[in-house]
Curated annotation (Swiss-Prot):
Annotated protein name in UniProt: Uncharacterized protein YyaH
Lineage: Bacteria, Bacillati, Bacillota, Bacilli, Bacillales
PANTHER family: GLYOXALASE_BLEOMYCIN RESISTANCE PROTEIN_DIOXYGENASE (PTHR36113:SF1), LYASE, PUTATIVE-RELATED-RELATED (PTHR36113)
Top-level taxon of origin: Bacteria
Segments forming domain VOC: 2-126
Gene3D superfamilies in alphabetical order: 2,3-Dihydroxybiphenyl 1,2-Dioxygenase, domain 1 (3.10.180.10)
Length: 126
């Protein structure tokens, strides 16, 4: 058994699609739009075959909180410490908030954590 995909609500579907394509080499399918339900989504497929569905419905405006129950972050493995550093530096230079890192965690992971445009936490690790 494997996870088929995970999904996240977003406010700006096109901006978030561009984010995952530009920084994480994702490839989006064609836009799905259900007019009756005011719902739109893209499935973004990454090099590993993992898929993320980004979804918009009406006005989802509640900002994420780091202290709520539910999903905490999504993590991307980039293959090396150097690539963690490079991608973190690129995201920081482009104006994204670096929440922490790059650093080695107490349990031995090398990672950084950034916020996307909508405040979702993205972990970048080896």
């Amino acid at each position: 058994m494997q996870i088929e995909h995970t999904a996240v609500w977003v406010n700006d579907l096109e901006r978030m699609k561009s984010f995952y394509e530009s920084y994480f080499n994702g490839e989006a399918n064609d836009l799905y739009h259900n007019e009756k339900k005011d719902f739109k989504s893209y499935f973004i497929t990454f090099d590993s075959g993992a898929r993320l569905e980004i979804m918009k419905k009406g006005n989802v405006t509640d900002p994420p909180s780091q202290t709520m129950t539910g999903w905490a972050h999504i993590a991307f493995s980039v293959g090396s410490r150097e690539k963690v550093d490079e991608l973190t530096d690129r995201l920081k230079a482009d104006g994204f908030a670096v929440v922490n890192g790059p650093r080695t965690t107490g349990d031995g992971y090398y990672e950084s954590v950034i916020e996307d445009d909508e405040g979702n936490l993205i972990e970048i690790t080896i």
